[in-house]
Amino acid sequence: MHSFASLLRYGLAAGATLASASPIEARDSCTFTTAAAAKAGKAKCSTITLDSIKVPAGTTLDLTGLTSGTKVIFEGTTTFDYEDWAGPLISMSGKDITVTGASGHLINCDGSRWWDGKGTSGKKKPKFFYAHGLDSSSITGLNIKNTPLMAFSVESDDITLTDITINNADGDSLGGHNTDAFDVGNSVGVNIIKPWVHNQDDCLAINSGENIWFTGGTCIGGHGLSIGSVGDRSNNVVKNVTIEHSTVSNSENAVRIKTISGATGSVSEITYSNIVMSGISDYGVVIQQDYEDGKPTGKPTNGVTITDVKLESVTGTVDSKATDIYLLCGSGSCSDWTWDDVKVTGGKKSSACKNLPSVASC
C-alpha cells in the first residue's frame, strides 16, 4: 500500500461591487454581498469575495460551475434564513478552485433552529456544503458553526481541505443529530488535514472512494473515524485510505468500519495509525458486517470483503460500560490484517466477536 501522504508530496448585479484600477481588473475581482449577485456574476470573476452574505430561506449559495482557477474568499459573517428544506446551504463546483476564509470570518448556520434531536428522521434540515465536482481544488481555513445536519458532502477528485473548524458543540444540549463533519463518496484523491470538529455524528465517514488521507484531526463528540456503511450504493469500493495522527474524545466510537448485511463490495488497503482515544462510550475499535436498515443485526455476511487493514498505535481508554474492541466478520471476508500496538482499555471484553483474523483480538 502506498501512503497517500507520500503521493501528496511527489458586482455585476445589485449587491455586487467591483474592485479595480482598470477594466481588466474590474472583470477579474468581484465582491458580492448577496447570494443572488454571486450566482449571477460568478462566471465573470477570477476572485470572488463573499462579504457578510445573508442567504435567503430555502436558497443555496450557488457557486457551481466556477471558471477554472477562481479564488473564493469568505469574509465577515455568512448567515442563512430559516426554512425546513434539504439544502444544501452552499454548493460549489469547478476545477482548480481555491477557497479560503478571511481573518475573523464566520459561517454561522445557526443550526439550533432546525435541531429536534431526530436528525434525518425529523423535520427537513439542510445539509451545509456540497463539494461535488470541485476537482483539483482546495478549501482552507473555514470557520463553521452549528450546521443543521451534515457539514461537508465531498464527491470530488484531488481535493484538499485544510484547517477546517466545525463547531457544533451547542448541539450536545440542543438536539443536534446526524451532524457528520466530512462525508466522502465517489471520490479519488481526498486530503483532509488538521480539522477541528465537535459534532454529534461521524467526524469522518467514507462510503466509497480511493486514495483518501485524513491527518491531524481533533474529533470531539460524535461517532468517531468511520468507513461505511459500505454496500447497497452505486459505488461500493473503499480503497487506499490512511487515517492518522488524530485524537477522538467523548465520542461513541473511535475507529469504526461497518458494511451492509447481504451487500457486495470491498474495503481494502486501510490504515489507522497513531489514533488516541478517550471518553469513548460504545466501542474503542469496532469492525462489523451486519448493518441493515441503519442498525446492527448481529448476523454478519461476507459479501463486502475487508482486507489489508492495518491498525498501528491505536491506543487509549473507553468508559467502563463500553466495549474495548468488537469484531464481527462474515465467513472468510476479513483477511490480511496487521495489528501493532493496539491497546484499548477501560471497558468490557466482547465475547461475541466472530471470524476475526488471527492477528486481531477482542
Swiss-Prot record:
Temperature dependency: Optimum temperature is 40 degrees Celsius.
Molecular function as annotated in GO: polygalacturonase activity
Induction profile: Expression depends of ambient pH (higher at high pHs and lower at low pHs), probably under the regulation of the pacC transcription factor.
Residues spanning the signal sequence: 1-20
Matches recorded under InterPro entries: Glyco_hydro_28, Glycosyl_hydrlase_28, PbH1, Pectin_lyas_fold, Pectin_lyase_fold/virulence
pH dependence: Optimum pH is 5.0. Stable between pH 4.0 and 6.0.
GO biological process, one term: cell wall organization
EC number in record: 3.2.1.15
PbH1 repeats: 156-186, 209-229, 238-259, 267-289, 301-322
Protein name as annotated: Endopolygalacturonase II
